[in-house]
Structures are given as structure tokens and as C-alpha cells.
């Protein structure tokens, strides 16, 4: 078997087990009478005159998994027994385009104020965003062994890439109401990168001799890393072990450090209300990049590299998520990459995951609003479409609710729901874009995290003062 992609297989599994972005997390913007209606389009009018959020105003955990599906991992017999079905699993994967993504975000503070026709919205947010993509052969080689890849003309094409980013976002939203029907909005952002790891391993091929079954590999691995912390003491790959263990202090110690790893982003949009029943909006969200400095770079480009060790000793470790990342990392360094020197690299850029959105709504009455949202989401160098249909309503502006159905090319179909309560100036909400995940609360870790392509929860409390519509009257 092989050891060259041990690290990437573990990272794929770790991504699923981490505190985790359902890529269609729209439920929050669908809740009536809530100030986050303009989260993805700064032109959508905010009903409140003043908005205040501190710490827990907007917290999001989510995960995307388009490849590892629980029903495709196992065969379920009539007697209730379950058996791992390796061939079924591998054949269910896309040849090249399998994605795992995870996200955590939290608004540290938010202050918004309406002054005449202008609404000013200042927001500071911390984000962790990670994505990994891999080919069918990447897991097929591990599951089925090298017997399926015999001969010079039949290599295992192992394609894997990863991008992990921890950064902050300071955004200034400006929304201007041109008239009673038309509003425009723009939200420039200052981005500060805390840490990034970018891995590109699209050129690795594993060859198995059809007579001797000996294996060789052509490896083309490129890794770039950067952080806001001092990396002067990091000169070898093994030095990252201690660095990773101290990562939990990164946000606290460098929360407002803006000396390096600077980036810029922007959201912009337009909204138009035809009458009290119909409205449309269009916008672009998260168009931008971060430039990473003080980088460390590792490259491994080898041909005919002999490999002969296994990826994992036991499949039980995979199924039970019993994986020690530090041990795997150290083994990888010693046996595959070699604990040789890494060197200082040049600046590099990573892009935000941009969305292009078009939406329209019909409101029969406050108790019945129907919305359609079409979006293109930039994932793995492709714009991927999705469509969300939603119902939302409000009872006396006190109880607000929404239900939605999303159809997505890359994250599957899902049913979302949300509930918000306005207790005077205090607004409390909880939303999800996949309510079905709640049916797996008592399931095993593997079943919980692989039963659906995406899952998320977003919750928070925010203070709002004044009602724009009442003031107009």
C-alpha cells in the first residue's frame, strides 16, 4: 500500500470531525424582522434604526461533505447486520470532484445606525474556513489496494488539494435608499490573516508493477504556510508539531494584529421593491483575497519513489474516528517527506469563496412571504449553482419563522428552518439549512457526519432599537 498520502487522508477525516460551512447557509437572511437580512447583500433594507451585537450576535458552525456518504459506505442486510462495502463506496465517488469543507465564524461586535437615507453598519468577524478536494483514486487506492492499478498505463491518479485559513474581517457596510423602491449597498472589508496552509498535490501518480507488484510514485507536492505568529524558529517540518499545539492561542494573542497578511474584500448589491408585495435583489458576496507574507514553503518533486507501507493499520480507526493527528504528522515527516529543511517563500494570495446571488420575493401578508434565491458559489475554481425556495412569516413581529428547500449541484438537497423571537429590543434566533441532521443526534459519529452532504447551525442574540417603517409613517 502507500504512505505518501497518509497526511491528506487524515486531514480529510479530520475536517469532518472538526467543529465545523454548509455552502448554502441562507436561512438567517430569510427570517423576517431580523437585522441580518442583509448579510449576503448589503443593499437589502434593514428594518431597524439601530443594531448592536456583541460576541454572541452571530455564531455559525457548519460542514460540507460531497463524497463520503454513509449509505454508500455500508451494505445493510435484512437481518439488521451492517457490512462495510468498499467497492460500493469507491464507485460512488466522483472521478475528480469530491469536496469536504468546514467553517466556523463569529461576530465579535456589530454596530449599525440609520441616518436619514443612509444605513451604516460596522462589523468585526473571525472566520475559520477549510476545504479539501480529492479524486476517486485517492481513496480507491487505499480501499481496494494496488491490485486495481497494474501496469505503466494504469496508474492511480491521486489528486488532492487543501486550503485552511483563519482570518478576521472588519467590514463597513453602507446602504443608501435612493427612493422608496431602490436601494444600493456596498461593504468594503479589511481582512487580516492569522494562519493559512495551502496544499497542492495534483500531480501524484502511483504505479504498480504487474509482475512483481512493487510500487513506485511520481510525486509533485507543493505546500505553502503562513501565520501572524513568528515563524523564525521553524526550519524543519517537525517544528510545526509544537506550532500546531499552540494554535489555540493564535486568535486571542493576535486578534487585532494588522501588521501583515493583509487582504481586501467587498460585497455589493442592489434591491428594488415594486410594491408592498413584490421585490427583487442582486448582489456579490465575498469578492476578495488575502496576501500571505513571511511564508514557509516545502516542495517534494520525485520520480520512481519506492513506497511500501500501509495507510492505516486498521479500518476500525477510520470508522471510529480514532486518529492521532500528531502521530500521523510525525510519521509522515519521518517516512515520506523527510524531515529536511523548509525555506522562506515569497508572498502568495488566497481568494475568498465568492457568491453571486439573485433573489425575488412575493409577500401576500406578514404571515406569508415566498422567496426564491439563485446563487453561484465559487468552490474549487468553479462556480457551482444552487436554488433555494423558502417560506417565511411573522406574527406581530414577535415570532418570526422560515422554512426552505435548497437544491444544489455540489452539496445536495436539504430542508432548512429557522425561528426568531423579538423580546422588545432583544432578538434571539436559531437557524439551520438542514433540519434532517437532528434525526441523527443519537447515531454514531460516522453516521452523523456522513449521512448528509451538508449541515449547519447558526444562532445568536442582537439588540435592535427603533423601526424604520414606523418612523416613516
What is the role of each PLM region?
Residues 1-26:
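Bacterial Sec-dependent N-terminal signal peptides
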Residues 23-473:
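Subset of outer-membrane beta-barrel
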Amino acid at each position: 500500500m502507500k504512505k505518501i498520502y497518509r497526511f491528506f487522508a487524515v486531514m480529510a477525516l479530520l475536517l469532518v470531525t472538526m467543529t465545523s460551512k454548509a455552502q448554502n447557509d441562507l436561512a438567517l437572511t430569510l427570517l423576517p424582522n431580523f437585522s441580518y437580512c442583509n448579510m449576503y447583500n448589503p443593499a437589502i433594507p434593514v428594518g431597524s434604526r439601530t443594531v448592536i451585537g456583541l460576541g454572541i450576535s452571530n455564531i455559525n458552525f457548519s460542514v460540507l461533505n460531497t463524497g463520503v456518504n454513509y449509505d454508500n459506505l455500508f451494505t445493510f442486510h435484512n437481518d439488521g447486520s451492517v457490512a462495510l462495502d468498499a467497492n460500493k463506496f469507491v464507485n460512488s465517488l466522483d472521478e475528480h470532484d469530491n469536496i469536504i469543507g468546514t467553517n466556523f465564524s463569529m461576530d465579535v461586535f456589530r454596530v449599525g445606525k440609520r441616518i436619514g437615507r443612509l444605513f451604516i453598519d460596522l462589523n468585526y468577524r473571525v472566520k475559520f474556513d477549510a476545504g479539501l478536494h480529492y479524486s476517486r483514486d485517492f481513496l480507491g487506492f487505499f480501499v481496494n489496494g494496488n491490485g486495481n492499478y497494474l501496469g505503466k498505463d494504469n496508474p492511480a491518479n491521486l489528486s488532492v488539494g487543501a486550503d485552511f485559513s483563519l482570518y478576521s474581517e472588519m467590514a463597513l457596510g453602507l446602504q443608501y435608499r435612493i427612493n422608496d423602491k431602490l436601494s444600493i449597498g456596498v461593504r468594503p472589508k479589511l481582512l487580516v490573516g492569522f494562519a493559512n496552509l495551502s496544499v497542492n498535490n495534483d500531480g501524484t501518480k502511483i504505479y504498480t508493477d504487474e509482475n512483481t507488484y512493487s510500487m513506485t510514485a511520481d510525486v509533485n507536492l507543493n505546500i505553502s504556510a503562513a501565520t501572524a505568529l513568528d515563524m523564525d524558529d521553524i526550519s524543519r517540518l517537525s517544528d510545526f508539531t509544537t506550532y500546531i499545539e499552540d494554535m489555540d492561542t493564535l486568535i486571542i494573542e493576535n486578534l487585532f494584529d494588522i501588521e501583515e497578511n493583509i487582504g481586501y474584500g467587498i460585497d455589493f448589491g442592489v434591491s428594488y421593491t415594486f410594491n408592498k408585495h413584490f421585490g427583487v435583489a442582486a448582489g456579490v458576496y465575498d469578492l476578495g483575497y488575502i496576501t500571505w507574507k513571511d511564508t514557509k514553503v516545502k516542495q517534494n518533486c520525485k520520480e520512481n519513489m519506492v513506497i511500501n507501507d500501509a495507510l492505516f493499520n486498521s479500518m476500525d480507526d477510520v470508522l471510529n474516528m480514532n486518529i492521532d493527528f500528531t502521530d500521523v504528522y510525525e510519521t509522515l515527516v519521518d517516512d515520506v517527506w523527510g524531515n529536511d529543511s523548509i525555506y522562506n517563500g515569497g508572498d502568495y494570495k488566497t481568494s475568498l469563496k465568492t457568491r453571486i446571488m439573485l433573489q425575488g420575493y412575493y409577500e401576500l401578508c406578514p404571515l406569508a412571504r415566498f422567496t426564491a434565491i439563485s446563487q453561484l458559489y465559487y468552490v474549487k475554481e468553479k462556480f457551482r449553482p444552487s436554488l433555494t425556495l423558502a417560506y417565511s412569516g411573522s406574527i406581530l413581529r414577535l415570532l418570526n419563522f422560515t422554512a426552505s428547500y435548497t437544491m444544489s449541484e455540489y452539496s445536495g438537497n436539504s430542508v432548512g428552518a429557522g425561528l426568531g423571537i423579538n423580546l422588545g429590543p432583544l432578538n434571539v434566533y436559531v437557524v439551520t439549512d438542514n433540519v434532517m441532521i437532528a434525526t441523527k443526534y443519537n447515531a454514531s459519529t460516522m453516521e452523523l457526519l456522513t449521512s448528509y452532504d451538508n449541515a449547519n447551525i447558526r444562532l445568536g442574540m442582537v439588540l435592535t432599537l427603533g423601526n424604520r417603517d414606523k418612523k416613516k409613517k
